[in-house]
Structures are given as structure tokens and as C-alpha cells.
């Protein structure tokens, strides 16, 4: 695995999301060249694992309430104002393990997104994102491995909310870079729901920035957001 370290880390608004090129309903279709996108795998529910030494809390993604989303600012030919291209998927799995001191247990903490399942409001855009951009047939999984988290304290609160900040290694097409996520969470009887987001450039992950005739411009920044529903695992 190639690991890329970058000096700049952009942090975002709250909202686990990957954003790329879209236009809102009623806008002319963005003319991205379509690629082979027939292969996709359904997300499988997180499997139980044996207790880890030192583990005090294990949170797993529930079977519903989870969305990963990408967002990229673009401006189309013939339009005075730019708009966001947005695609999302509900095909994500994973878990977060924390020890008694509040540190992430990295070996058993990981989230996985099915790269072939992002859907926007335009089929041709989806083909471009899955095919030429993410190469989902070759690299079917986007992974996020948490390395630290702040805002989740033990014992887990039974109610209330908190701001969180998480650092994690994001891997797309076998290129890994550190990211910082900021968001908010709500606690309720052993569950943790909320959203978080980060941002990075195309170059950060060695991705090709789209250049097609119908686009006047595409922002260099990709926003990735995740809405999550985590439940504690005994």
C-alpha cells in the first residue's frame, strides 16, 4: 500500500461522506464519459469479533441509518452560478474499538465503503465516478481506519450530545493519507448517532480532476461526509 502524507489537512462541517460532481434535479445532465460500472457488492453487516485485550467499548455500524456522501463544487456551461455535485451510498460497514483510557484500538477499528455503489442524480456521472475516478472494479473498497478520537468519553453517556474530532487514515485506490474529521454526535442508551466530514484535494489522493466540455470549472476540493448510527456491542 502506498501511503501519501500531505502537509495540509482540511477539516469540514459535520455531516462518514465522499463528494464528487453533481447537479441538482432540473439542471442539464453533466456529460461525464460513462465507464463500466456493472459490478457492485452489497454491504454485509459487521461481524462480531472476539473480545480484544484492553477493549472497553466497541461500537459497530447498525444495519440502517448510515450514509457516505461525496460533494464537489462545479459550474456548468450556460449557468451563471456553480452548484454541488453530490453522490451517496448506504453500503458501508465497520466498527470502532476504544480502550479504557479512551484511545482507539487501531487493529480492530475500520470502516469500509463500497466504491461501486455511489449514486447521484445522473447515471453518466455515476459511471464516471465509479469507473474512471474510483476504478471500483479494481479497487472495490474505500477504507477509513481511525487513529484517534476526541469527544467520546467512557463510560458512554446515556443521553446528550457532543462535538467530536477524529483522525483516520483514508485509503482510495490503494493511496492512503491522514484525514481529520469533525462533527457532532448524540448519545442514547448505548447508541451513538451523528455526522462528520473532512475535505481534501484531488491531488492528495492522486485522483484525476475531471475535464469535460460541459464544465466551466470543477473545484479542487472534495468533501467527504458520513452520517452514522453506531450501537455498542457487548
Spans of model-derived segments:
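Sec-dependent bacterial lipoprotein signal peptides
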Residues: 1-21
Amino acid at each position: 500500500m502506498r501511503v501519501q502524507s500531505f502537509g495540509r489537512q482540511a477539516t469540514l462541517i459535520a455531516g462518514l461522506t465522499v463528494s464528487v460532481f453533481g447537479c441538482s434535479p432540473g439542471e442539464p445532465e453533466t456529460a461525464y464519459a460513462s465507464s463500466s460500472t456493472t459490478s457492485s457488492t452489497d454491504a454485509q453487516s459487521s461481524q462480531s469479533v472476539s473480545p480484544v485485550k484492553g477493549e472497553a467499548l466497541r461500537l459497530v455500524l447498525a444495519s440502517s441509518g448510515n450514509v457516505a456522501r461525496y460533494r464537489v463544487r462545479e459550474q456548468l456551461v450556460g449557468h451563471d452560478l456553480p452548484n454541488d455535485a453530490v453522490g451517496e451510498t448506504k453500503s458501508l460497514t465497520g466498527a470502532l474499538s476504544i480502550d479504557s483510557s479512551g484511545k482507539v484500538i487501531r487493529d480492530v477499528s475500520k470502516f469500509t465503503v463500497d466504491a461501486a455503489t455511489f449514486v447521484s442524480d445522473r447515471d453518466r456521472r455515476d459511471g464516471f465516478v465509479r469507473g474512471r475516478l474510483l476504478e471500483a472494479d479494481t479497487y472495490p473498497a474505500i477504507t477509513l481506519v481511525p487513529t484517534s478520537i476526541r469527544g467520546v468519553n467512557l463510560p458512554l453517556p446515556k443521553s446528550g450530545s457532543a462535538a467530536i474530532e477524529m483522525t483516520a487514515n483514508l485509503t482510495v485506490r490503494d493511496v492512503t493519507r491522514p484525514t481529520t474529521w469533525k462533527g457532532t454526535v448524540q448519545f442514547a442508551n448505548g447508541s451513538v448517532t451523528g455526522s462528520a466530514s473532512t475535505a481534501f484535494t484531488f491531488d492528495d489522493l492522486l485522483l484525476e480532476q475531471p475535464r469535460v466540455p460541459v464544465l466551466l470549472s470543477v473545484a479542487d476540493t472534495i468533501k467527504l461526509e458520513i452520517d452514522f448510527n453506531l450501537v455498542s456491542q457487548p
